[in-house]
Regions:
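Short, compositionally biased
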Residues: 1-55, 99-100, 189, 218-225
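Functional-site microenvironments in short loops/helix caps that host divalent-cation chemistry
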Residues: 3-19, 58-208, 212-217
Length: 225
């Protein structure tokens, strides 16, 4: 996790109606020890998904665009089909942070040259007009620089499903080694932010959730091993 005050401060810069409680599930800040693992360099593309599953549910069409509009169950099925799995939330965040502890993987200031979020080209009323990443919706995977682990789009483009159930207070009692998330729940965690978010949503610490059977044109995934 990270200081939820950071998220609140950034959100306030672009939206004065932000509330600090929106970021409470990022607390408390805690250290976690993880065994070794591998994470896909890119978000799963529409081509990859269609080749493996036989269909492409995406709202935005493009072979090198990330697949979106996929349920958590479909993401899990795809990863298992190719001999992998969805990453845990802890694995995902560790990889997203890169080799530092900044607010964003690249530093402490929002930068439209580093991630696809809702800025000048975005058609939502809450867009951040003073920044411009050049995309209105999803971007082809790898369009932005990788973090210092060599991973692309860990910030923005599409949210990514992870394996964990969401629990507002899980961080207060989570294991210090290889946490797997709560044993049950109603909603699954999504990480990384997307083309539809304020910059605050693309921080490595940001957490959100949705029902596992939900389909959204701003949610995709990548696999782990």
């Amino acid at each position: 996790g990270s200081d939820s005050g950071q998220g609140y401060k950034i959100c306030q810069k672009y939206n004065k109606t932000c509330k600090e409680k929106w970021f409470s599930d990022e607390q408390p800040v805690h250290k976690v020890k993880l065994d070794g693992y591998h994470l896909d360099i890119y978000e799963i593309t529409q081509d990859e998904f269609k080749h493996a599953i036989g269909k492409d549910p995406s709202e935005f069409s493009g072979s090198h665009l990330p697949v979106e509009n996929v349920t958590w169950f479909e993401a899990k099925k795809y990863c298992e089909h190719i001999g992998k799995r969805l990453p845990t939330e802890a694995e995902w965040e560790r990889a997203a942070r890169g080799k530092n502890n900044f607010v964003f993987w690249w530093g402490n200031k929002a930068d439209s040259g580093k991630a696809n979020f809702c800025d000048a080209q975005c058609e939502k009323r809450w867009k951040v007009s003073q920044l411009d990443d050049g995309f209105s919706y999803t971007a082809p995977v790898g369009s932005f620089p990788p973090n210092n682990y060599g991973l692309f789009d860990m910030a923005g483009n599409v949210y990514e499903w992870v394996s964990d159930w969401h629990d507002e207070g899980y961080y207060r009692n989570s294991p210090l080694e290889n946490p797997q998330g709560p044993k049950s729940g109603r909603k699954k965690v999504m990480r990384g932010g997307s083309w539809i978010n304020y910059p605050t949503g693309v921080r490595p610490a940001d957490r959100t959730d949705s029902k596992p059977n939900a389909r959204m044109d701003f949610v995709g995934f990548r696999c782990a091993l």
